[in-house]
Amino acid sequence: MADLETYFKELVDGRRKAVADRLLLAFLTPFSLVYALLMRLRRATYASGLFPVRRLGKPVISVGNIVAGGTGKTPTVATLARLLMARGKRVAVLSRGYGGSLAGEIRIVSDGKTLQATAEEAGDEPYLLAASIPRLMVVVGADRYRAGRLAEDRLNPDIFILDDGFQHLRLHRDLNILLLDSRSPFGNGRTFPAGLLREPKSALQRADIVIFTRCVEGDPPKAGVAIDKPICRASHVLTGVVPLPGGQAQPFAHLAGKKGLAFAGIADPAAFFDAMEKEGLSIIATLAFADHAGYGEDEIAAICRLKEASRASYIVTTEKDAVKLASYLDRLGPIYAAVLEVRFLDEGVVVAQLEKLLYK
């Protein structure tokens, strides 16, 4: 599965240049045009009122993207939640629970005090948010309106954050935040399946604020299109590693001089591996799994075999993967989770939008 995902990304990015690859991309292009038309029609049905848009009793902030893959939605949600909680707000995150086993069931993952679902049930991203941010409430369910109503009935939130909500048009939002990866904001500019766009670039007009993620401080984002919305730059910052199953966070220098194995089941595992090396780790072996991969006997055995073959003395992975490894830690030996934060380089832009919503 991971190999297929990698091939598809390389195909639409233009890195696959064989004749067969070019023919495949040409074959997919008409389907891409049809998909774009369908997305425009879908958007129009909600905008016209033909499909109902439901409204919760408390304000909703949506965080999402228009490009498939990792733009940093989860760490951005975490940063927003902390900003709101620092202002005394009771925050509830509404998530689909992608990759979890609940199959559409509405479930409270955290009531702000205790965890009430496992990572396998809730999905890795909702569970990570619930486990890593004290007092944050998290509810999962395919129907985010029903999930929000459950939260209103039982948790009494002041405000909601809708995780990966840009395309969830059936729920009204009071602030629509769109994330774009500064390295490649729109991929090859085509919609699925000939590109990575989940909907046409014209969807930018629905955003109230655009956040460019993975920015390098001082470098202006390059979108290639005019954006008449407030813009914030954000950087991804790795702050250190935490030993599993838990313990004091350590700087990356803690692993200096040791040879490590890195694995990840995220949208862009190669970026994670590169980041580990940039932090000074000596990574001698890597293993990529599909995004939101579940970890069972086969996956753990593959990691253990590679660790033994490479003679790595420790393993490092992402926080998102780490929450799914509790049953296997004794077999993996020394293992660490790299801690990632999103920091707003133009925080005032975001805060102004939040305060406009909170105090209107």
From Swiss-Prot:
Keywords: ATP-binding, Kinase, Lipid A biosynthesis, Lipid biosynthesis, Lipid metabolism, Nucleotide-binding, Transferase. One of its GO terms (cellular component) is plasma membrane. GO terms for biological process: lipid A biosynthetic process; lipopolysaccharide core region biosynthetic process. Pathway: Glycolipid biosynthesis; lipid IV(A) biosynthesis; lipid IV(A) from (3R)-3-hydroxytetradecanoyl-[acyl-carrier-protein] and UDP-N-acetyl-alpha-D-glucosamine: step 6/6. GO terms for molecular function: ATP binding; tetraacyldisaccharide 4'-kinase activity. The keyword Nucleotide-binding applies. Transfers the gamma-phosphate of ATP to the 4'-position of a tetraacyldisaccharide 1-phosphate intermediate (termed DS-1-P) to form tetraacyldisaccharide 1,4'-bis-phosphate (lipid IVA). This is Tetraacyldisaccharide 4'-kinase. It comes from Geotalea uraniireducens (strain Rf4). The lineage of its organism: Bacteria, Pseudomonadati, Thermodesulfobacteriota, Desulfuromonadia, Geobacterales.
